[in-house]
């Protein structure tokens, strides 16, 4: 993306308004967002009363009628897990160009499988409580925030306005790119110094783009402060960085598990000499993580559940 395109996106997000010819969509106030949330709630309840299926209900109905495979839920979970594992593999092999190319192919294929799995559902999702309520919520917001020639604009058919609004939404990959670019980083660095990141009025809520840009700016800021901060090449690669996130999360969870074991068994010294660790029933310990420690040569040799003795 050219620098001028980066700046246009950033300044458009900062302005908060969506402008298309003589139509303008302004940021919603917090009161308007509250009212729209109430529209969603009432619409959802009304749909339930009218016998319309929820999103989960639609999935179950489609499975029962052979419109989705019986393995739908298992396949969905397995494919999402595979995507996470592939991203971790991508990070772990970041120095091997040939491996990275092959892994990216695996990731693309797995995402395609997940998309294909949901394809039949996407054709019917407009018949759910969630979709109907979300549409009515959006129409409510756009009715309150859309202007034509500086006058409130509430057309009988909102499809054109909805399309304009949807086209203004930045994808996650674009938001992440903008959060990393120098133009935005120089603006972000001035936050908190009596400097406005966005043009919004005091009672305006953040737009979706503004909220997402703040979220990712904070994420990248935290990454830079991390003791295990990855290289710029990793940070600039969304999938590879996701792999780093997942690995860091697993590391933190493993450390937490080990700390819980130490508390249950006494001091660290006693832990290092123990051949057996007794885990009380109901303790929040993931045995598989501890077994990983055993395989890597750490001092945890065996995990034995002894509920009666622990009580």
Locations of regions flagged by a protein language model:
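Generic alpha-helix detector with strongest preference for long hydrophobic helices that associate
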Residues: 33, 109, 115-127, 155, ...
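Charged interaction scaffolds used for protein-protein
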Residues: 1-19, 33, 148-311
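Low-complexity, serine/threonine/proline-enriched polar segments
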Residues: 46-120
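Helix N-terminus capping/helix-initiation residues
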Residues: 29, 69, 96, 124-128, ...
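Charged, long alpha-helical segments
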Residues: 119-157
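Charged/polar, solvent-exposed surface patches and flexible loops
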Residues: 8, 35-42, 81, 112, ...
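Poly-acidic low-complexity segments
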Residues: 73, 78-79, 96, 142-143, ...
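N-terminal leader/presequence-like segments
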Residues: 1-71
């Amino acid at each position: 993306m050219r620098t001028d395109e980066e700046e246009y996106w950033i300044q458009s997000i900062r302005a908060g308004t969506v402008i298309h010819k003589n139509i303008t969509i302004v940021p919603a106030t917090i009161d308007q967002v509250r009212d729209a949330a109430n529209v969603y709630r009432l619409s959802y309840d009304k749909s339930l009363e009218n016998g319309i299926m929820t999103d989960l209900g639609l999935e179950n109905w489609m499975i029962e009628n052979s419109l989705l495979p019986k393995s739908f839920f298992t396949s969905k979970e397995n494919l999402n897990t595979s995507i996470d594992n592939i991203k971790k593999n991508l990070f772990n092999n970041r120095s091997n160009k040939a491996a990275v190319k092959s892994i990216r192919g695996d990731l693309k294929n797995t995402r395609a499988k997940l998309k294909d799995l949901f394809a039949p559902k996407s054709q019917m999702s407009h018949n759910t409580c969630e979709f109907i309520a979300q549409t009515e919520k959006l129409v409510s917001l756009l009715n309150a925030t859309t202007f034509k020639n500086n006058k409130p604009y509430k057309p009988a058919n909102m499809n054109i306005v909805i399309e304009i609004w949807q086209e203004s939404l930045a994808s996650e990959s674009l938001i992440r790119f903008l959060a990393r670019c120098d133009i935005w980083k120089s603006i972000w660095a001035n936050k908190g110094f009596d400097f406005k990141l966005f043009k919004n009025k005091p009672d305006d809520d953040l737009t979706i783009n503004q909220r997402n840009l703040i979220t990712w700016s904070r994420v990248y800021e935290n990454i830079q402060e991390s003791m295990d901060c990855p290289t710029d090449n990793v940070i600039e690669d969304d999938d590879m960085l996701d792999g780093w996130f997942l690995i860091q999360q697993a590391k933190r969870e493993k450390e937490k598990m080990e700390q819980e074991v130490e508390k249950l068994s006494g001091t660290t010294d006693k832990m290092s000499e123990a051949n057996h660790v007794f885990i009380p029933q109901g303790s929040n310990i993931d045995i598989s993580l501890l077994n990983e420690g055993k395989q890597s040569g750490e001092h945890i040799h065996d995990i034995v559940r002894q509920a009666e003795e622990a009580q």
